[in-house]
Amino acid sequence: MRILHTSDWHLGRSFHRVSLLAAQREFIDHLVTTVRERSIDAVAVAGDIYDRAVPPLAAVELFDDALHRLADLGVPTVMISGNHDSARRLGVGAGLIDRAGIHLRTDPAGCGTPVVLSDHGGEVAFYGLPYLEPGLVREELGAPAAGHTAVLGAAMDRVRADLATRPPGTRSVVLAHAFVTGGAVSDSERDITVGGVASVPAEVFDGVDYAALGHLHGCQTITERIRYSGSPLAYSFSEAAHRKSMWLVELGAAGEAPSCERVECPVPRPLARIRGRIEELLADPDLERHEEAWVEATLTDAVRPHEPMARLARRFPHVLTLVFDPERPPEDPLASYAQRLRGRSDRQIAEDFVAHVRGGRGPDERERALLGDALEAVRSEAHEGVVAGEGVVPGEDVAPVGENGAGAAVGAVAGEAER
């Protein structure tokens, strides 16, 4: 069976205020063409169909067009919801469109109920595991703890239990939206850390022939049976070096490692990150290759130059972002806020702030637990808003935990201290 594995379309997303709708439409054209020309037997879409819980109308229309075109080809498609999607909204009408061969799996209760397809080699069971927010699905799945590993492990227990009832030789594909240990992250993925842990071990997927993963935006191989397709388009400058693609997965007999081929996606415009003093950037002949790219420019001048964006735009007409990061020693007290926070998690930021306001005395174990609980509470509240559609304004995204989580966590510790 030939399976086309894709994910993280993020329909409706813009790139630094530049609409990507035309590029996303071009990707859908490419997807449909690939399905037709490469004799694809099934399409697997591993979550984050939309970028927001309440997507713009144009994104919904594009998704509708994609579904109609895939259905017209008569190729079964299995999709799951991701952490950016509203599972309930995406799943509306799922039972009806099942009849057209489009199988939307957004309910955690259905983790152990596969979509069963067949080819000359027999049956293939596709298990759709939508994004599982630990605080919301732990009880439903009977997980022993509220972490990602526990809830995904409980879902996979259901998969393996069902698979054990299938005829010998049944092959299996799991679609999941998660951060698996060993995967490379980028700036455009929403943090899903719970209890200080964001990732799950690859071993959680033991026992299946192929795990089609979504969430991470780089196309990558965790093991020969566990892969991320990545997003079809770049959604942050941290993805400038990515080769955007899909996986064409060919399943052989049960137990055999699948054969996987990368299928490149169209690139609407390359990305470039340039860094240096403004006069160097304007004069360097080596940067000529970036003059038609979307550009992120980081200026290292000791003093902020006059009208830097206008000057850069004369050479790089598609420059989108400007970062001012003067070169100073890391220990310099004037080092930029961005420099000091670079690479630090919400939890680390909150713990450092507690130490700062208490004259160097950081949080103890009990306070660290409070910080973790507060961060998880903010994440659960945000995700509940996505699931239920409450508190979400059309055209706006739910704030990542990083935008308010550290502050909420510090507030929890402060409140406990007052008691």
Regions found by a protein language model. Name each.
Residues 1-68, 72, 373, 377:
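N-terminal active-site segment of His-dependent metallophosphoesterases
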Residues 37, 42, 251-419:
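Accessory, non-catalytic peripheral segments of nucleic-acid enzymes
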Residues 41-47, 79-81, 171-175:
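Short beta-strand segments at enzyme active-site cores
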Residues 71-79, 291-293:
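Short, surface-exposed connector motifs at secondary-structure boundaries
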Residues 80-125, 209-213, 218-281:
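Active-site-adjacent helix-turn-beta-strand microarchitecture at beta-sheet edges
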